[in-house]
Design a protein with these regions (language model features):
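Hydrophobic core of transmembrane alpha-helices in multi-pass small-molecule transporters
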Residues: 16, 86, 98-113, 302-318
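C-terminal transmembrane helical hairpin of 12-TM major facilitator-type secondary transporters
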Residues: 274-326
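Helix-loop-helix hairpin linking two adjacent transmembrane segments in secondary transporters
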Residues: 128, 136-181
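Structural signature of the two symmetry-related core transmembrane helices
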Residues: 74-88, 278-293, 372
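Flexible cytoplasmic inter-helical loops of multi-pass small-molecule transporters
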Residues: 179-200, 394-401
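Cytoplasmic helix-loop-helix junction between adjacent transmembrane helices
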Residues: 103-139
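Extracytoplasmic gate region of multi-pass secondary transporters
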Residues: 25-26, 206-261, 324, 354
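Conserved MFS/SLC helix-loop-helix module at the cytosolic interface between two early adjacent transmembrane helices
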Residues: 58-96, 271
Length: 402
């Protein structure tokens, strides 16, 4: 194993462990709903609070050029440790919704230091094969996001202990960063603080179109991740019970989300061989089709529902890394970290709307139609990437493979 791939392995491990914080509360929502008497709005709020905190964290990071002015490694480990602390505080000392919302918001702010800086560190190790490398990193993020569902699905741990397990995993990730993760030989030039760069990185058409493609992807992704567990549980209830090939809804959710790591790997390979725009358009077309059709399996044969959900879980994340890779290839080198952070901030702002939208849609139109509202994202994303492909600047992508 080369040094670059060893570093990618370590960075991916750290990211997997750290991102277990993200959906830790979402994984225990049924228990929280029973104990605290949560309304659907309150349950959605616990997920949206993390998104909102992440947005604020990435916005502050972008406005201060934090990942370009300071060591991305330092930003990453500090963010992970603080996120673990806020998550553990919820488990240890919170007994009602509003303090939980505040701490979930704080966890989101801290996680802004875990994700974008990791992409920048990885980019210092890879020029060739960067799409595959970022794909593997996002795959680790995917498995990490699903981990609380695994803990909940295969153990009898109460919800507080489940959150503490997630915090312990995150601290282990910070230790990996501290002891073994380093910057690579292809370092981006240091930057001085310049508040204008947070917006200026998207002043040119090509990065802006890549960002629009990313927005379409994000409209769909986090709403699916947030509510697929509820969909799978409700589908079994509608049928009168049963399981997904012996798996309960929580364990099935872990399988659906975690298998997205395969999509990240395949998407990375396809992107480096076929080009960024081609691979992202294919992935969004497939995931959009799944969003449009999975509702028709609701209450039907569990294996059919699980199969469509797995295909959706794989294709919905397959393109994610390629939008980030495109930004690293299209943006000014000195401000790649700021560009990634700004893109991420805008994308996560949009997820708050789609996450909030699903519960009222499910209540009014039923689960059969709720996820269909997500198809607009990949449809517009395909259009944006097709327009990017037609620009002269797209020749910078993948060494000329658009």
């Amino acid at each position: 194993m080369t040094r670059a791939w060893r570093q990618l392995t370590l960075l991916s491990l750290a990211e997997l462990l750290a991102l277990s914080l993200w959906f830790s509360a979402s994984a225990v929502l049924p228990a929280l709903t029973r104990e605290w008497g949560l309304t659907p709005g309150g349950a959605a709020g616990l997920t949206i609070a993390v998104q909102a905190g992440f947005i604020v964290g990435t916005l502050l990071s972008a406005l201060t050029n934090l990942p370009d002015v300071f060591s991305a490694r330092t930003v990453m480990k500090v963010g992970i440790v603080l996120g673990a602390a806020t998550n553990a505080s919820l488990a240890l000392w919170v007994f009602s919704l509003w303090p939980a919302l505040i701490l979930r918001f704080a966890t989101g702010v801290c996680l802004a230091g875990a994700y974008p800086p990791a992409m920048k560190i990885m980019s210092t190790w890879f020029r060739e094969g960067r799409g595959l490398a970022i794909g593997i990193l996002v795959g680790a993020l995917t498995v990490g996001s699903a981990t609380p569902h695994l803990v909940r699905g295969v153990t009898a741990l109460p919800w507080r202990e489940t959150l503490l397990v997630a915090s312990a995993l995150a601290v282990a990730g910070a230790i990996v960063v501290q002891l073994w993760v380093t910057d690579g030989p292809y370092r981006f030039p240091s930057a001085r603080f310049d508040i204008r760069m947070a917006a200026a990185v998207f002043g040119e058409r090509a990065p802006r179109l890549a960002c629009f493609g990313y927005l379409g992807h994000m409209w769909e992704l986090y709403a699916m991740w947030a509510w697929i567990a509820a969909f799978l549980a409700a589908s079994l209830e509608e049928r009168g019970g049963g399981s997904y090939a012996g798996l309960n809804a929580s364990a099935a959710t872990f399988v659906v989300v975690a298998l997205g790591a395969l999509g990240c790997w395949a998407g990375g390979l396809a992107s480096d061989r076929l080009g960024r725009t081609t691979s992202t358009m294919i992935a969004m077309a497939l995931s959009g089709a799944c969003a449009a059709t999975i509702g028709f399996t609701f209450g039907g044969p569990p294996l059919l529902t699980l199969l469509v959900a797995i295909v959706w879980g794989i294709t919905i994340i397959a393109d994610s890394a390629q939008f980030s890779t495109a930004i690293t290839e299209l943006s000014p080198p000195a401000y790649v970290g700021t560009a990634l952070t700004t893109q991420t901030c805008v994308g996560f702002a949009l997820t708050m709307i789609s996450i909030w939208l699903i519960p009222p849609m499910a209540a009014r139109a039923g689960w059969r139609w709720a996820f269909a509202t997500l198809t607009i994202g990949p449809a517009l994303g395909v259009l944006a990437m097709a327009r990017l492909r037609a620009t002269p600047e797209s020749a910078k992508l993948t060494g000329g493979r658009r």
